[in-house]
Amino acid sequence: MGCSAATFILVALFGSSSWMGTNSVWMQLPLLTSELPEQWNLPSYLAGVVQIACIVPLIYTILHKGVKSFTIPTAPLIIALLSLACCCQLGLSFFWSDYSEIFGAPRSWPLYSLLFGLAIVNAMSNVLFMPFMAQFHPAYLNAYFVGMGLSSLAPSLLSLAQGTSMFKCDEKGVAERFPPNFSVSIFFFVIFSFTCVALFAFIALYRSGAHTHFATPNKKEPNEGTPLKKDLNNTSSSRKGDDEDESPIEIHETGAPAIDAIVSELDVTFREELQKSFRDANYLERSAMINDDSEPHPVDYITGVKFTFLLFTTALVNAQMNGIITSVQSYAALPYSQATYHFAVTLSNVVSPLSSFLPFFISVRSIPVLAILTACSTAMTAFIVYLAALSPNLIFNSVTIGSALSIGGSLIAAGLHSYLRVVFASLLREGHQSESRLFWCGVFIQIGSFIGSAVMFPLVNIAHLFTSAPQCKSIS
């Protein structure tokens, strides 16, 4: 069966919904911090909300793996989640600026609630969307990962077109604001429209039956993301008959991948590894896509101490990326200008998906080299924290130098973190128990992200170790 251009586009649009909601809120932080009462503390609150929401897919996977009677049809659940994302995105366009007093302080609870809903949808995409794509021809994985890249790139480009809220200081030291090219409400409404397109694309994709063209004939659960082990064995035995050389593969009944809630841009690496898993599971053999005599190349799998090291560094990198930097970046950039924060956040989200493609060209397997790169990313994170600790003072007492260092540090950190995250997941994915290894990779991703946010939240909001700078400040 050939690949359809229409199906390719539908899959890409469907994949774009994976993390677009959360990314869209993050792209608006430079404007939200200037409008909402939490001000510079807002990013740390939102990071905590996202991490709490990421517990939901973990619970889902535990139930799906541990409770055999727990079954929910995949496609209807995806439609329900995308509908929830549309509702939350539409709600943001109207209620993002609302707040009320809770526990003696003004809180932007509508923003928290709506972001929580979006984060649930985005995190659940890792345990639902990927298994669903296992039912398609492997060539469509390219389209899905293109869509995942768009979920970060599209809000970033839209934010660049929007610009930021500039201001100038009058003689009395009062900031006079100039609005961006279009408002936060319009931004969220455009993202809402994009999410609706993704929802309708999935419905059209499912109704087209493209996923059934690659399904096994005797598959009993059409809504499962991947077939059960017994179905694989039955199909293989019925097709091969007396063939004794078939390689067994260990596939869990759920077919759910790891809970890698933040690792949404593992584009090329996951594509290659999933295609390899399709080949190992005789997907391609059953559909006559490859010859029976093809064999996977031997790989020096990561085990033992190296495996433990990779899990630890995975947690460390994600703690920095999803917990530490997101909590203090406002303090590291806003003292220099609103535009500095805007470009640091926006361009970082452009660099991240692009860096995820680097392992396709530059693959590193050496543990010492990976340790050095991890140390470099940690040093860059420490530099961003140092800039934040200087606030309201400026490094070298210079707006120009400070802005360049703040933006440059954010871009380098984002690039290193994204690259390392892909490489770690690729190495951990290798092996005969690939799903189990990838599951633990996802667990440590979430552990690292949670610890990073849990450590930074009290430091920012309770201990008040970081200080906001006044908008209008004389520079000597």
Curated annotation (Swiss-Prot):
Disruption phenotype: RNAi-mediated knockdown causes a severe reduction in the number of laid eggs. Induction: Down-regulated by high levels of riboflavin. It holds the Pfam family SLC52_ribofla_tr. Expressed in intestine and pharynx. GO terms for biological process: IRE1-mediated unfolded protein response; riboflavin transport. Residues 22-41, 97-113, 162-185, 328-342, 388-393, 459-476 are cytoplasmic. InterPro entries: Riboflavin_transptr. The keyword Ion transport does not apply. It is a multi-pass membrane protein. It catalyses: riboflavin(in) = riboflavin(out). Belongs to the riboflavin transporter family. This is Riboflavin transporter rft-2. It comes from Caenorhabditis elegans. The lineage of its organism: Eukaryota, Metazoa, Ecdysozoa, Nematoda, Chromadorea.
